[in-house]
UniProtKB/Swiss-Prot annotation:
PANTHER family recorded: INOSINE-URIDINE PREFERRING NUCLEOSIDE HYDROLASE, URIDINE NUCLEOSIDASE
GO biological process entries: nucleobase-containing small molecule interconversion; purine nucleoside catabolic process; pyrimidine nucleobase metabolic process
Active site: H240
Record-linked PROSITE patterns: IUNH
Signal peptide extent: none
Record keywords, A-Z: Glycosidase, Hydrolase
UniProt record similarity statement: Belongs to the IUNH family. RihA subfamily.
Protein name: Pyrimidine-specific ribonucleoside hydrolase RihA
Length: 313
């Protein structure tokens, strides 16, 4: 039986590819997509969800827009990474359907209440919507199987020296999620920086030849430009968000450890840092399954295999 999931995302090139991977995988049942503000403004990320689902011919999936700003802070966006639209690069279709007349949290609540089994939440942007859900509906925690997030790291940041972007945008929300007592699975920079897509991989995807694979290749053409800067030391582009979906599909591709994680919300230099108690120094019980390594080639092969599914539909 397919695993029911809700995807809360802020597309964003890698969010869009995570969405593609989820919908190419019969092991997963995508019950709803909610948008968060992060990689671009809330209106643009919501529109990008609708554009991608239009491309994928999945306008049957309910969509709702989420919080317009973090819980306690002004919104920061990553337009320097994802461009003016948030999905610069390919010529995506205009949306052919509209979002639900409700908020992201209201849609999540509806899905959770109607589900016969616990639902996995996958959050690939800032954690604002998920935190609002957890705080406002404690009675539904039992309907959440786990929360799989892309965010954080063990010490290295990509937005500040200490903080990864998604957590930095709304650290208060992330702290609520990590301390919720629910099972948390974290795909942080430690693993996503090892999930680099190389130029040869992009050409492999392009050669698949169907419109979805071509769009993914064109998304990556744009996404790779930002990551060519010498400061990163990358050979390709780290494909952060699809690691969450890949873990659900093939956890054997990943090395994980269970550790306690907290989020720094006030540090002068460390706001948004995920503090990972790797050596169990605090005595705190582990609250997070932390991805620390990946079979990169297996990850690329999975993406290529699933992109090819769109050729036979």
């Amino acid at each position: 039986m397919a695993l029911p999931i809700i995807l809360d995302c802020d597309p964003g090139h890698d969010d869009a590819i995570a969405l593609v991977l989820a919908l190419a995988s019969p092991e997963l049942a995508l019950k709803a997509v909610t948008s968060s503000a992060g990689n671009q403004t809330p209106d643009k990320t919501l529109r990008n969800v609708l554009r991608m689902l239009t491309l994928l011919n999945r306008t049957d999936i309910p969509v709702a827009g989420g919080a317009r700003k973090p819980l306690m802070r002004d919104l920061i966006i990553a337009d320097n990474v994802h461009g003016e639209t948030g999905l610069d690069g390919p010529a995506l279709p205009e949306p052919t359907f509209k979002p639900q007349a409700c908020t992201a949290v209201e849609l999540m609540v509806k899905v959770l209440r109607e589900s016969d089994e616990p639902v996995t939440l996958v959050a690939t942007g800032p954690q604002t919507n998920v935190a609002l859900l957890l705080n406002s509906h404690p009675e539904l925690h039992r309907k959440i199987a786990r929360i799989v997030i892309m965010g954080g790291s063990m010490g290295l940041g990509n937005w500040t020296p200490a903080a990864e972007f998604n957590i930095f945008v709304d650290p208060e929300a992330a702290e609520i999620v990590f301390q919720s007592g629910l099972p948390i699975v974290m795909a942080g920079l430690d693993v996503t920086h090892r999930a680099q897509i190389m130029s040869a991989d992009v050409e492999r995807f392009r050669a698949i030849g169907n419109p979805v694979a071509t769009t993914v290749a064109e998304l990556l053409d744009f996404f790779m430009e930002y990551h060519k800067a010498e400061k990163w030391g990358f050979h390709g582009a780290p494909l952060h968000d699809p690691c969450t979906i890949a873990w659900l599909l093939k956890p054997e591709l990943f090395t994980t450890v269970d550790r306690w994680v907290g989020v720094e919300t006030q540090g002068k230099y460390t706001q948004g840092m995920t503090v990972v108690d790797y050596y169990s120094l605090t005595g705190n019980k582990p609250n997070t399954t932390l991805m620390v390594d990946i079979d990169r080639q297996g990850f690329v092969d999975l993406l290529a295999e699933r992109l090819a599914q769109f050729s036979i539909r």
